[in-house]
Amino acid sequence: AMEIYSEPWFRTRLDYYLRERHPQLQYRAQLLDRRSAVAADLYRRTCDAGGSAECALRLADRSLFRGLLFSKFDTIDLILANDFPDIPEDQRRTVARALLTPCEPIFAGYALGDDFASRPEFRQLKAELRLGIRQWIDDNGPPGYEAKLRHRVRTRKMRNGEPRKTNRNK
């Protein structure tokens, strides 16, 4: 018996994928509706034309996830995991999501696509993101949580309830 994959099944898969890999897109109902309908239709038509369920699912998935295979969020999360070990693992996704907007100008300098992570420019993008994230954290503190280090620095600036003058302002 051949599996029959319906529109709600494709929608659930895409919704989960967006939550995990593209949290900034997860509530785009129009994207979920359109992609899941097209994938379900493509799956059904391929099976009706005599294609195997495996082939039909592969075609439907290609349609469902087109343009979403490269994830800015995953890239930032990877950099945080590798280069910013002070950020607790349980808070890394929150920090990565908060860094999407400040990192957008860096991403804008590249022609991103589904195969981008396998292209040579990916290494350059990661290097630029590392520098950009380091600069952003140096200027603003880590987004999404109260870092212990930042808290200690702030506490040291207080004397007798009065802020001490610092050379932090450039």
Protein language model regions, located:
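C-terminal alpha-helical interaction appendages
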Residues: 1-170
